[in-house]
Amino acid sequence: MKTPTDQRFDYVKIGLASPERIRQWGERTLPNGQVVGEVTKPETINYRTLKPEMDGLFCEKIFGPSKDWECWCGKYKRVRHRGIVCERCGVEVTESRVRRHRMGFIKLAAPVTHVWYLKGIPSYLSILLDMPLRDVEQIVYFNAYVVLDPGNAGNLSYKQLLSEDQWLEIEEEIYAEDSELVGIEVGIGAEAIQRLLQEINLEEEAERLRTEIVESKGQKRAKLIKRLRVIDNFIATGSQAEWMVLSVIPVIPPDLRPMVQLDGGRFATSDLNDLYRRVINRNNRLSRLQEILAPEIIVRNEKRMLQEAVDALIDNGRRGRTVVGANNRALKSLSDIIEGKQGRFRQNLLGKRVDYSGRSVIVVGPKLKIYQCGLPREMAIELFQPFVIHRLIKLGIVNNIKAAKKMIQRGDANVWHVLDEVITGHPVMLNRAPTLHRLGIQAFEPILVEGRAIQLHPLVCPAFNADFDGDQMAVHIPLSLEAQSEARLLMLACHNILSPATGRPIVAPSQDMVLGCYYLTAENPKAQKGGGRYFASMDDAIRAFDQGLVDLHASVWLRLPVGEKVKTNKPDEEVLETETLPDGSIWKYYRERKTREKDGEIISQYVRTTVGRIIYNKTILEALVV
């Protein structure tokens, strides 16, 4: 049967849920017509039988059976009883995996505010009520009264805050024999906030604000725009303002807050169970106090404690004292589970592990081409294993997959030859987190290398914002031919020379490369070894350096072809000295070069340089010619 979860979806939208919607999440009608879903007891499991308590946080009637196709009392076992509701325990016989998605709810004896909307930045409750956050907090946590209806009292105004003493004085005036005060209403706690929110007509308020914004300026205008934006968002999403005050709390499925038995008979439980237990205990106590008509001060204190328990459940530590468990460790609330790097979204939903991917430390690979990366053999054989197996079978080296896997495990020589064939022309994608722009993922042609580190060309580092101080990168293999061609045509590093954000080159030499270029071309008068020598070609000079006959920075003379023009840093046209040879030719000495001329024609020329500059020039020349 196709369930709604089988359907594909494009995005997840988080919004306010109405009390009716929360009840719908948790309320279910069993095949026998019984309606279940409300969690009324704080118990989890029975300490003797180790079975979930009925109507508790792990109730099988509400959330489904703990064991596949078995009811709580054990009357029905086996799959043939599918869909039957046990007459004794009321548990529906079904799969235990339903406990991963079936929810419950807690009906609160008094409404409470949602701490995200009260203490968030900005505080939507204070913006919507147009009251300072401190005043709203005083009302919610039973420190001050708020005027809901001033009646005919001239000294009272709508939404005015009153202390306990002020309200007692007004009460005495109201109940005096000669009192003319009528219609005065005050409130306290989340009930008062709920009443104020219900009295706001969002459409009318939005129109009034638009009119005021036109006439206002400065700080007041900015405040009005802020409030209008919040109201418009409420209207656009179809949410009611009073939904920010909760009268029903959802209980997440029990398998998402499990209780696990440890060695020695002890139990490890999710922190959420403790937080839910606090809410249920306080809620049940408040219900009993209301039933026996307890004094208002006691009821009010219990309502405040219920508000604090729900705050801790939703976001522990956001307001007031943090609820702690054993060893003074703060309990993880619903917000803690969702938010942050280790939260449900970033860790589990966005950060899923995928097949055909690997991860390793990056090191510099200066001998690579810009479109190449060094892939460790150990990683490559694992990532390309299906391709290698297919190729081994196709070549007739092995007959089946099992034999191919054994051959790979042995490290047979044939495997490495086949791997070389497979990776030729098969690009891989390298990604460095955080992927802040599209150049955070680029394609490269893999080159097999020894060791366990991925080699990266230094020129692509700025695009990845990578350095070699321990950074790690992920490797992904495009599988289909379409993905491979897309990676080759669009994502190959040599096609991503310019930054898509600025249009400027993002591939530019930096750090080690600039230092290396400087070192090669620098002059050092102290480098005397081999200084003043003559070399017929660049290769001769480099060979002499390799043999240790000349220093890298020693000043030497290099013979150049006659037609080649020599450019120097400073003007070098002035002849410093001339020398006439017996054959009639003339040596002309300049600052950085010298030429031999006969009959007005140059027959040979030399330039003063260093071996480092020769190496630099030769490298650049070869790169340009190729």
UniProtKB/Swiss-Prot annotation:
Highest taxon in the source lineage: Bacteria
Protein family (similarity comment): Belongs to the RNA polymerase beta' chain family. RpoC1 subfamily.
GO CC, one annotated term: DNA-directed RNA polymerase complex
Cofactor, how bound (note): Binds 1 Mg(2+) ion per subunit.
Pfam families recorded: RNA_pol_Rpb1_1, RNA_pol_Rpb1_2, RNA_pol_Rpb1_3
PANTHER family according to UniProt: DNA-DIRECTED RNA POLYMERASE, DNA-DIRECTED RNA POLYMERASE SUBUNIT BETA
Its biological purpose: DNA-dependent RNA polymerase catalyzes the transcription of DNA into RNA using the four ribonucleoside triphosphates as substrates.
GO biological process per UniProt: DNA-templated transcription
A GO term for molecular function: DNA binding
Enzyme class name: transferase
Binding site for Zn(2+): C71, C73, C86, C89
Binding site for Mg(2+): D467, D469, D471
Matching Gene3D superfamilies: 1.10.40.90, 2.40.40.20, RNA polymerase II, clamp domain, RNA polymerase Rpb1, domain 3
Keywords: DNA-directed RNA polymerase, Magnesium, Metal-binding, Nucleotidyltransferase, Transcription, Transferase, Zinc
Annotated EC: 2.7.7.6
Catalytic activity line of the entry: RNA(n) + a ribonucleoside 5'-triphosphate = RNA(n+1) + diphosphate
Subunit composition and interactions: In cyanobacteria the RNAP catalytic core is composed of 2 alpha, 1 beta, 1 beta', 1 gamma and 1 omega subunit. When a sigma factor is associated with the core the holoenzyme is formed, which can initiate transcription.
Names of the cofactor(s): Mg(2+); Zn(2+)
Name the UniProt record assigns to this protein: DNA-directed RNA polymerase subunit gamma
Lineage: Bacteria, Bacillati, Cyanobacteriota, Cyanophyceae, Oscillatoriophycideae
